[in-house]
């Protein structure tokens, strides 16, 4: 037990720290408004392609009726090879030049960030997005098994979702470049909320259909929802970088690293709550038993169905509204950059 805790804590902490450094680095590599949109959406595309490679492993094993343990072990072997290779490439093949700039104490910066309304709107939107996506991700296999009785299709369904996520990023990237980042991100989350609400009614409609019909219809709905899956996150990150420029123009201190640490730390709260809350509520409050699958009571299955759909829908709509109020446009950012220089 302790070995697993320490291993996961170390791995997750290292990933988080590397992620903060990478996001902060992006604000230096792409200092202009549209350059950041291009860079961070490209980063997301590469990340999803890498994710597709990983999730294709259990999907392929699933087709050949491999066991659950075999799926987990295969991903573990991939990680054992991939992580050291990534570290090696990052340390020895990436050119990183230190730039001269004023820096501030991160803890002192955090106090200032708590008062930054523009930043905190983005952070709140990110927390809502993280909570919604983490909740649906954590409950997806349970939902497929207990509600639709399609547990054997779960890995392939996730694979379809991620394929269309790659396609969707190009759409939201185009809208962000054509109009503004906050408009594209807000529209993306509005679309996600509508699609997830539609999925709820589709699930009710196909609940008594044959297995093949349920799988086909659900795959189509997941594909349409997948278009929105990774569209908002890179745009929000790009907007945080713009806010760090505004902060630097005001204080003459570069706080991008501290700001992304602040943003990432609070966003992780959304992920953490979404992982813990559903299982505690389902098992301890309403008595849902994961091991029973579709044999759970109708009340507990209905609770799962409503929780799985309506909590994310509310989060998506709220985040969409919050992002629509963002106040740093392309023109405003140009003025900010002039003040820095």
Task: Kindly give the residue locations of the regions a language model identified.
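Membrane-embedded alpha-helical bundles of multi-pass transporters/translocases
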Residues: 1-341
């Amino acid at each position: 037990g302790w070995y697993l805790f320490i291993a996961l804590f170390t791995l997750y902490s290292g990933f988080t720290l590397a992620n903060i450094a990478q996001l902060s680095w992006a604000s230096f590599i792409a200092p202009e408004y549209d350059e950041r949109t291009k860079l961070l959406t490209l980063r997301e595309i590469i990340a999803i392609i890498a994710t597709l490679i990983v999730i294709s492993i259990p999907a392929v094993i699933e087709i050949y009726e491999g066991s659950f343990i075999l799926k987990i072990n295969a991903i573990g072997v991939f990680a054992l090879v991939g992580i050291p290779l990534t570290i090696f490439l990052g340390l020895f093949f990436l050119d990183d030049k230190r730039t001269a700039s004023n820096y501030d104490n991160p803890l002192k910066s955090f106090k200032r960030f708590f008062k930054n309304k523009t930043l905190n709107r983005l952070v709140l939107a990110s927390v809502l997005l993280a909570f919604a996506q983490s909740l649906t991700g954590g409950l997806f296999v349970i939902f497929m098994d207990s509600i639709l009785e399609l547990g054997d299709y779960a890995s392939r369904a996730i694979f379809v979702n991620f394929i269309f996520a790659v396609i969707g990023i190009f759409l939201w990237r185009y809208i962000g470049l054509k109009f503004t980042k906050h408009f594209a991100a807000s529209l993306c989350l509005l679309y996600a909320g509508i699609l997830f609400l539609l999925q709820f009614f589709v699930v009710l409609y196909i609940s008594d259909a044959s297995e093949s019909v349920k799988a086909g219809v659900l795959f189509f709905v997941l594909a349409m929802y997948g278009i929105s899956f990774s569209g908002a996150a890179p745009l929000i990150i790009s907007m945080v970088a713009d806010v760090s420029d505004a902060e630097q123009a005001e204080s003459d201190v570069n706080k991008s690293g501290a700001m992304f640490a602040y943003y990432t730390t609070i966003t992780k709260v959304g992920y953490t709550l979404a992982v813990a809350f559903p299982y505690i509520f389902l098992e301890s409050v309403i008595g849902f038993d994961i091991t029973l699958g579709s044999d759970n009571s109708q009340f507990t299955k209905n609770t799962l169905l409503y929780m799985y759909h309506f909590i994310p829908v509310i989060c998506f709509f709220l985040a969409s509204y919050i992002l629509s109020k963002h106040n740093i446009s392309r023109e405003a950012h140009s003025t900010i950059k002039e003040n820095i220089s």
